[in-house]
């Protein structure tokens, strides 16, 4: 692994390390694209759609039962020389998909702070509590330094390069149309039939806001993710 390849380094890389962040970047030299995956932002659906539409992949035999299928067909930054990485960064179609921070934060809590998850175990070790924290307690944990401890809830603008350096930023909330725009660009001529749904970690967070968010929590989460809200064009209602 090329740990000295700094081509794709972001603020998040410096916080979480190369391995944790670079493994989220998928590169296709054949189709000249870079997909920068943001956790808790429809990754499984997007990847499954790419695998299904890629004309160079026999999807029928590959399937998606193998959770490592994406690694068989697409590269990571450490698979490329520094020269090739720089060339790809400059010339390939670079895209990502973002999610409303209010939904992404709640989804991270619902998915990762459950019995048996290593993140809950880490939280318990830090706090000395044996209980599953409430959403309010989770947000308090983020406020006290936990915000930058895990890629599943670190601000999205810390994971990806500056928006002006990305070819296309799609939104999970508009995935039908935005994924069409991406596939038309990277797989010209291929038939787009909509997102291929695959949601092993779906929490339904967007439909549970009213259950978990108080006016105080809205204010606090907005403060934590103010840069995401501003640069990615999100708010409580959009």
Language-model segments: which ranges?
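Membrane-interface amphipathic segments in extracytoplasmic regions
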Residues: 1-238
């Amino acid at each position: 692994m090329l740990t000295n390849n700094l081509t794709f380094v972001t603020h998040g890389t410096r916080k979480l390390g190369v391995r944790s962040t670079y493994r989220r970047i998928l590169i296709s030299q054949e189709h000249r694209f870079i997909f920068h995956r943001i956790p808790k932002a429809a990754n499984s659906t997007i990847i499954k759609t790419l695998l299904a539409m890629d004309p160079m992949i026999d999807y029928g035999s590959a399937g998606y039962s193998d959770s490592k299928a994406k690694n068989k067909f697409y590269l990571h930054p450490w698979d490329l020389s520094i020269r090739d990485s720089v060339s790809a960064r400059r010339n390939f179609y670079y895209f990502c998909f973002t999610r409303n921070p209010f939904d992404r934060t709640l989804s991270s809590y619902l998915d990762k702070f459950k019995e048996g998850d290593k993140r809950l175990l880490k939280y318990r070790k830090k706090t000395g509590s044996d209980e599953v924290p409430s959403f309010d307690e989770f947000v308090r944990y983020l406020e006290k330094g936990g915000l930058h401890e895990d890629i599943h809830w670190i601000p999205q603008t810390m994971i990806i390069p500056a928006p002006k350096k990305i070819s296309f930023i799609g939104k999970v909330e508009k995935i039908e149309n935005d994924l069409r725009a991406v596939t038309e660009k990277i797989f010209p001529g291929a038939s787009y039939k909509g997102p291929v749904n695959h949601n092993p970690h779906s929490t339904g967070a967007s439909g549970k806001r009213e259950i978990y968010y108080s006016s105080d929590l809205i204010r606090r989460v907005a403060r934590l993710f103010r840069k995401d809200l501003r640069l990615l064009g999100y708010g409580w209602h959009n």
